[in-house]
A protein has these predicted regions:
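Noncatalytic N-terminal accessory/assembly modules of large enzymes
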Residues: 1-210
Length: 211
């Protein structure tokens, strides 16, 4: 089996896929960590060369083979970045590669009549929003950093405390939540709204208070 192992962390979709899969393992979603079996490559369909350990994760509609490496913080395993393998229960010989968060979420759906399917669809939409917003904010981060370099200034050159706080608030906004995969999503915002209100763009706008 020819496998795609070159997943780039700079691509928003692949970055989000990594965060999602690691969160599924960490939070033990559908028994991902507690009910799965750690096996060697000889047991995996196609006998891939890498990595050495895979989780045989049995789900309602089939088996998801998850390639992992040992982890040291908050979870025993983490995704190796190699493509997962989906083996449907009704087609034991028909396997397919899974390397995108939408494919992973589709594997979790029990059946078309299960309530979880709608919830997973909603979350998939949130992930798409997070991917889009991440790409847009990444462009602004590169533009802002380039502007700072050309100006030859840093936060130390800001005389007022309020200016320094806003500077660091903007800088922190480019960092993701440490654990929630799709935290980058600002639901209901398009690119114009992000530029007008999101802290990544350091906008100025009038507050409208409700008493």
């Amino acid at each position: 089996m020819t496998r795609n192992t070159a997943l780039s962390s700079t691509d928003p979709g692949q970055y989000l896929t990594r965060r999602l899969i690691d969160a599924l393992i960490r939070e033990d979603v559908a028994g991902c960590q507690s009910d799965s079996q750690a096996v060697g490559t000889a047991t995996v369909p196609g006998s891939p060369e890498r990595p050495a350990t895979w989780l045989r994760w049995t789900l309602a509609r089939g088996v998801l083979w998850l390639p992992v490496n040992p982890a040291t913080f908050m979870q025993r395993w983490q995704w190796s970045s190699d493509a997962l393998i989906w083996q449907p229960a009704d087609q034991t010989e028909g396997v397919s590669e899974v390397d995108h968060y939408e494919q992973v979420l589709a594997c979790l759906t029990a059946n078309e009549h299960d309530d979880s399917g709608e919830q997973l669809a909603v979350y998939a939409d949130e992930c798409r929003t997070a991917e889009s917003h991440a790409a847009f904010c990444q462009k602004e981060r590169l533009r802002w950093f380039d502007e700072i370099r050309h100006q030859g200034q840093s936060w130390k050159d800001l005389s007022r405390l309020s200016e320094r706080l806003l500077y660091f608030d903007r800088l922190a906004a480019f960092l993701d939540h440490p654990f929630y995969p799709s935290a980058r999503a600002k639901s209901g915002f398009d690119e114009a709204a992000l530029a007008a209100y999101a802290p990544e763009f350091a906008p100025r706008f009038q507050l409208r208070w409700l008493a």
